[in-house]
Each structure stands twice: as C-alpha cells, then as structure tokens.
C-alpha cells in the first residue's frame, strides 16, 4: 500500500527520483499515465493489469467510456527505475501535469500520484477547507 507525501525535483532531462519508501512496492517497472485533477498516476504492473481488466470491460458503445479509455491509455508509458532510483517522465506527461522542477509524490493506496508542487498546494488547501464536509459525504460509500 502506498502512503505519504514526498517533495522532489525534476531535472532538466525530465528525470525524477522516486521516493525510496515507494520504490519497493512500485517495482523496477511500472506504468505512468495521465491522472485526474491534473496529476499523473503511477501503477505497479500488477495493479495496472487489474485496472486494464476493468477498463476493457467498459461499454464500448458509451462515448464517455471510449473517451476516458482513449485519453488514459494514449499517454500510458512503462517506466523503469535507473540505478539511482530515477524515472524519466515523458514530456507529454510533464506538460499535462504542468511539471517543471518542484513536484510532490504522494502515495494513494494502490498507486502513486505525481503533482506539480503549486498545483498540489492549491488542491490540498481546498481539500483541507472542505475535509469535514467531504468526510460526511463518504458515509454514502460505507466509510
């Protein structure tokens, strides 16, 4: 399970060190793709396979399902850690998530998320302001 918040930098070649606390669970190879809310999602290969099964079961006749699957898969890329524990984030993904230099990597249960630091700060502030109300709404999901 992934959890925690880690601050890292992306170098001029688009490389970022994956936090050591997340590396073992993530594995040497994993999939990185567009996420929601303007961040990137990173999945261990096993989790990606589980997600693939669910995505492939989506109804092809539904336009939203087709759009989501296309957008999600078209940016997906297999990443491999180098000897220094870094990954190279493709420019298309860096542009999507507005990643320049300072970023935040967070663990979110079965995946990691990579955020531009300013975007994460803004998201966190809004989430903190509304956390009690959001928590109350989670009752509908059995929490």
Swiss-Prot record:
Gene3D superfamilies the UniProt entry points to: Transcriptional regulator MraZ domain
Q: Does the keyword DNA-binding apply?
A: yes
Q: Where in the cell is it found?
A: Cytoplasm, Nucleoid
Q: What is any one GO biological process for this UniProt entry?
A: negative regulation of DNA-templated transcription initiation
One Pfam family named in its UniProt record: MraZ
What's in the GO CC field? cytoplasm; nucleoid
Q: Which UniProt keywords apply?
A: Cytoplasm, DNA-binding, Repeat, Transcription, Transcription regulation
**Ranges where the SpoVT-AbrB domain occurs:** 5-47, 76-119
MF terms (GO), sorted A to Z: DNA-binding transcription factor activity; transcription cis-regulatory region binding
**Family that this chain belongs to:** Belongs to the MraZ family.
State whether it acts alone or in a complex, and with which partners, per the record. Answer: Forms oligomers.
Q: Which NCBIfam families match?
A: division/cell wall cluster transcriptional repressor MraZ
Q: What is this protein called?
A: Transcriptional regulator MraZ
Origin organism is Enterococcus hirae
For this protein's source organism, the top of the classification is: Bacteria, Bacillati, Bacillota, Bacilli, Lactobacillales
């Amino acid at each position: 399970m992934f959890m925690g918040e880690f601050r890292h930098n992306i170098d001029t070649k688009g490389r970022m060190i994956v936090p050591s606390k997340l590396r073992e669970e993530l594995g040497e190879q994993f999939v990185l793709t567009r996420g929601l809310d303007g961040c990137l999602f990173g999945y261990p290969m096993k989790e990606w396979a589980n997600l693939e099964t669910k995505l492939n079961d989506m109804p092809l006749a539904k336009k939203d399902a087709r759009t989501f699957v296309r957008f999600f898969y078209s940016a997906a890329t297999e990443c491999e850690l180098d000897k220094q524990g870094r990954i190279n984030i493709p420019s298309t993904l860096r542009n999507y998530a507005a990643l320049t230099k300072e970023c935040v990597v967070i663990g979110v249960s079965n995946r990691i998320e990579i955020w531009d630091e300013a975007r994460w700060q803004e998201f966190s502030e809004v989430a903190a302001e509304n956390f009690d109300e959001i928590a109350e709404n989670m009752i509908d999901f059995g929490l």
